[in-house]
């Protein structure tokens, strides 16, 4: 793991909560407080383009998906997959502060049978043989 990970901070404006890393105003992710499962940022919406290759009306098929997310951000993708798709999800995040802040401030659910959060370097997770079919 990296020796020095950036600090995590939050800001909020006009009903949108933002996640920042380090001492910068740059946004890593966000959540509309009144719609915590909605995907707010355009670039995060584009990350869901893979759904174009799936029949989104087939709920059973979506619930059989297992998504892997390398980096948590503000947990937008994770919450969307859990809430809207009902899929199983594995998230790999190197910064334990990001995980803690997402639980406290961004409505990230606690891990369960459908939702796993691994605090580790994503490179090591990808290289692990047991994750080959995820």
Model features per residue range: what roles?
Residues 36-134:
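The AdoMet/dcAdoMet-binding core of the Class I SAM-like
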Residues 1-58, 82-84:
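Rossmann-like AdoMet
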């Amino acid at each position: 793991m990296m020796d020095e990970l950036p600090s995590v901070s939050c800001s909020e404006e006009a009903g949108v909560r933002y996640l920042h890393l380090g001492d910068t105003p740059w946004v890593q992710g966000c959540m509309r407080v009144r719609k915590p499962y909605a995907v707010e940022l355009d670039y995060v919406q584009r990350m869901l383009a893979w759904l174009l290759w799936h029949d989104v009306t087939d709920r059973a098929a979506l619930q059989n998906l297992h998504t892997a997310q390398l980096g948590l951000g503000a947990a937008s993708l994770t919450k969307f997959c859990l809430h809207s798709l009902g899929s199983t999800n594995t998230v790999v995040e190197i910064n334990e502060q990001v995980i803690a802040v997402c639980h406290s401030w961004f409505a990230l659910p606690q891990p369960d049978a459908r939702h796993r959060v691994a605090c580790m370097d994503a490179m090591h997770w990808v290289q692990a043989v047991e994750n080959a079919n995820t």
